[in-house]
UniProtKB/Swiss-Prot annotation:
Protein name: Large ribosomal subunit protein uL15
Pfam families, A to Z: Ribosomal_L27A
Molecular-function GO terms, alphabetical: rRNA binding; structural constituent of ribosome
InterPro entries given in the database record: Ribosomal_uL15, Ribosomal_uL15/eL18, Ribosomal_uL15/eL18_sf, Ribosomal_uL15_bac-type
Subunit structure, as described in the record: Part of the 50S ribosomal subunit.
Regions of compositional bias (Gly residues) in chain numbering: 24-37
UniProt KW RNA-binding keyword: yes
Function description: Binds to the 23S rRNA.
Region described as Disordered: 1-56
Organism: Psychrobacter arcticus (strain DSM 17307 / VKM B-2377 / 273-4)
GO biological process, one term: translation
Gene Ontology CC terms, in alphabetical order: cytosolic large ribosomal subunit
Keyword list, A-Z: Ribonucleoprotein, Ribosomal protein, RNA-binding, rRNA-binding
Family recorded in the similarity comment: Belongs to the universal ribosomal protein uL15 family.
Length: 146
């Protein structure tokens, strides 16, 4: 016997029929179509936006503003030591990090963090390095140029 393509069909209950609202009392969704009676949310067109509290000052305006996002943080990328193995060559700069797709194209600065191992001696040019990463780089025979 076997399975035939022309005999395939979805499982029982897999396909639900769409609810046709406003199509008679017997459907259970006739007349008001599940919207209730009167009020702003029963009207056609639009409803109240999310977070609207009926004219009362909403929560996001009752609470004070705090903090800020540093512009420098938005243009500085963090790179792990373990990710440096993807770089071809032994010089690490912003350009080589972008070429290896380790940082985004819009990043202007980079900082190397101590996470993982350095496999070969790299020369870092124009990149900030954390204290722990600096020790690991120098232990592997690498150097850091400001």
């Amino acid at each position: 016997m076997g399975l035939r393509l022309n005999e395939l069909s979805p499982g029982v209950g897999a396909k639900k029929t769409a609810q046709r609202r406003g199509r008679g009392i017997g459907s259970g969704l006739g007349k008001t179509g599940g919207r209730g009676v009167k009020g702003q949310k029963s009207r056609s067109g639009s409803s109240v936006r999310s977070g609207f509290e009926g004219g009362q000052t909403p929560l996001y305006r009752r609470l004070p503003k705090f903090g800020f996002t540093s512009k420098m943080a938005m243009t500085t990328a963090e790179v792990r030591l373990s990710e440096l193995n993807q770089i071809e060559g032994d010089v690490v700069s912003i350009e080589t990090l972008k070429a290896a797709n380790l940082i985004r194209r819009d990043m202007k600065r980079a900082r190397v963090m101590l996470s993982g191992e350095v496999t070969k001696a790299y020369t870092f040019k124009g990149i900030k390095v954390t204290k722990g990463a600096k020790q690991a780089i120098e232990a592997a025979g690498g150097s850091i140029e400001e």
